[in-house]
């Protein structure tokens, strides 16, 4: 009996990643000075120089056609190169190996590179995200040059990217990486006012706090930061910091750290950054530093992340302030009990609202929504997104169509709608209207174009009743 041999498939993977500045080694024989960081480091010196030189040549060549917009990517059969100039003269390059299928043809193994599977916009966004994450924790390249010349910059790049590149799981990158949006927690006015009042009280009591951010269930409720800074901080919190503490919580619910509190208040609060055990007199701690408003005031801040149940608060304090154990104890005793009560209130209100709206059966559609003005993002396609994986509830073929539709939207300024019928008989709809984008996947194989259009109108009326979508 003959069995069909299954094709072996290999996902896209990181081949190399490097950062260079052509001005640092302008003369012959000094080419190595241009290279500020190169991964993998084991690559032979001459090959590094050759690869950087090739990228330089490509950028220079494409500048002759468009001086202000040089190359963003280079397609070859086996890989794809992405270029990004985040600061003048500093170039970041990411080389991704194309997905691969291993097939059997006439008894021989044949390799087929599937270069069409990679979407430029997705991986260009990932490269830009690499820079923004570096800048959040290290500041700009040029500031490092001002402070400690090229050696300091090289040292910072090595320390950061050596670890960060290990968290880049390119096989799970998709449209959400293009948007880099923020998921907002739905809240009634009264509970929102309680949170606002809590933040005002804390900022008044702890007057060294410069900015505050409040999240519940990994979704944003309040932020005092600028949008672009909040966007990358949100990415760090939800894909790196919070997941680190999720597993221990799932193993067994936290018991109150100090059940006996004045006024019999329960206290579930604890630091996610900083001191692990405040009752230890010898406790050693360090808060991470972040850099915000790098375009103008260039602020260096300590990041304190404090959590009680499902509520998390980030306090940002000027890095010139000396933070002591006494300050941490004061913050803990002040914030812990109040945040515990607030987290219970939010949970109760959320459950009431869910009961009122009713638990509907599994809908026949899944969607991604993004608003460019406030970076609001909502997805029923993604079950979970962490650095190591992105669980999606739809086939990769459909995710690729969503990316293609987004690419079409980018090329035009006008509002528009695109409807596609996939090979698997699913309907995929993209709608762009007034700085908002909506992508819907419909599992209605027997529907026609008119019926699909009606379904989309119904969806907009039920899920986005307060948002105006042009017909």
From Swiss-Prot:
Claim: rRNA processing is one of the keywords in the record: no
Cellular location(s): Lysosome membrane
GO terms for cellular component: lysosomal membrane; Mon1-Ccz1 complex
Any single Pfam family the record assigns to this protein: Intu_longin_3
Keywords recorded for this protein, A-Z: Lysosome, Membrane
Record-linked InterPro entries: Ccz1, CCZ1/INTU/HSP4_longin_1, CCZ1/INTU/HSP4_longin_3, CCZ1/INTU_longin_2
Superkingdom assignment: Eukaryota
Primary residence: membrane
BP GO annotations: vesicle-mediated transport
Keyword Metal-binding recorded: no
Entry's family note: Belongs to the CCZ1 family.
Name of this chain's protein: Vacuolar fusion protein CCZ1 homolog
Organism expressing this protein natively: Xenopus tropicalis
Name of the coding gene: ccz1
């Amino acid at each position: 009996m003959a069995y069909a041999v299954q094709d072996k498939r290999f996902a896209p993977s990181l081949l190399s990643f490097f950062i260079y500045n052509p001005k640092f080694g302008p003369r012959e024989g000094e080419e190595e000075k241009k290279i500020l960081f190169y991964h993998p480091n084991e690559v032979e010196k001459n090959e590094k120089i050759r690869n950087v030189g090739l990228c330089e040549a490509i950028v220079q060549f494409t500048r002759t056609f468009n001086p202000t917009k040089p190359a963003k990517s280079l397609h070859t059969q086996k890989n794809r190169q992405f270029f990004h100039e985040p600061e003048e003269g500093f170039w970041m390059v990411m080389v991704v190996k194309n997905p691969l299928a291993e097939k059997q043809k006439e008894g021989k193994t044949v390799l087929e590179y599937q270069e069409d599977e990679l979407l430029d916009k997705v991986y260009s966004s990932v490269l830009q995200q690499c820079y923004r994450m570096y800048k959040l924790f290290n500041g700009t390249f040029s500031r490092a040059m001002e402070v400690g010349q090229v050696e300091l910059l090289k040292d910072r790049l090595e320390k950061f990217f050596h670890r960060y590149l290990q968290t880049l799981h390119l096989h799970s990158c998709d449209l959400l990486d293009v948007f880099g949006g923020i998921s907002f927690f739905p809240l009634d006015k009264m509970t929102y006012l309680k949170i606002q009042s809590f933040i005002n009280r804390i900022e008044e009591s702890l007057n060294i706090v410069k900015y505050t951010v409040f999240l519940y269930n990994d979704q944003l409720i309040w932020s005092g930061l600028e949008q672009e800074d909040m966007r990358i901080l949100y990415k760090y919190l939800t894909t790196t910091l919070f997941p680190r503490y999720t597993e221990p919580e799932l193993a067994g619910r936290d018991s109150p750290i100090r059940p006996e509190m004045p006024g019999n208040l329960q206290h579930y609060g604890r630091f996610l950054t900083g001191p692990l055990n405040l009752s230890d007199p010898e406790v050693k701690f360090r808060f991470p530093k972040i850099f915000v408003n790098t375009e103008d005031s260039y602020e260096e801040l300590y990041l304190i992340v404090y959590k009680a149940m499902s509520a998390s608060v980030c306090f940002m304090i000027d890095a010139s302030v000396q933070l002591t154990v006494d300050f941490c104890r004061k913050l803990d005793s002040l914030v812990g009990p109040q945040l515990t009560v607030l987290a219970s209130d939010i949970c109760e209100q959320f459950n009431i609202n869910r009961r009122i709206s009713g638990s509907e059966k599994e809908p026949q559609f899944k969607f991604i929504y993004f608003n460019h003005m406030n970076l609001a993002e909502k997805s029923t396609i993604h079950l979970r997104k962490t650095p190591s994986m992105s669980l999606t509830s739809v086939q990769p073929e459909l995710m690729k169509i969503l990316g293609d539709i987004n690419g079409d939207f980018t090329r035009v300024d006008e509002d528009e709608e695109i409807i596609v019928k996939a090979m698997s008989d699913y309907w995929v709809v993209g709608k762009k209207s007034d700085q908002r984008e909506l992508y819907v996947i419909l599992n209605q194989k027997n529907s026609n174009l008119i019926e699909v259009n009606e379904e989309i109108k119904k969806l907009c009326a039920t899920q986005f009743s307060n948002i105006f979508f042009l017909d």
